[in-house]
Amino acid sequence: MLGFIATLEHAEMIGVNPEVAHEHMAGSNFLHAVAQAWDAGKLFYIDLNDQNYARFDQDWRFGMQNIKPAFFLVKFLEDVGYQGSRHFDAQAYRTEDYEDVKDFARGCVRTYLIL
């Protein structure tokens, strides 16, 4: 994808939005994908969530399943001074009420800040 972007007429307007769960579904190393996008100047936005490897899109709370890779991702983003958007693309359980959904979202942010 990054190589293709460089061939576009207005490549400066195009970046990537990597998502933890999508890379895990493919069995890829998310940190490598993020580092490549950062190095190319194309890391515009990032979706933080979690899931088991090689499964359907589960959208679990960030750091819920793979805490060590989540730690190294946060470390990378903070070390390089990433200033772009961090989106927690995670889904609370369908049986949760409004307050539980807010607690779930706070939990995603708390995990990021702890790491």
Label each region the model flagged.
Residues 1-115:
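Histidine-acidic metal/acid-base catalytic patches
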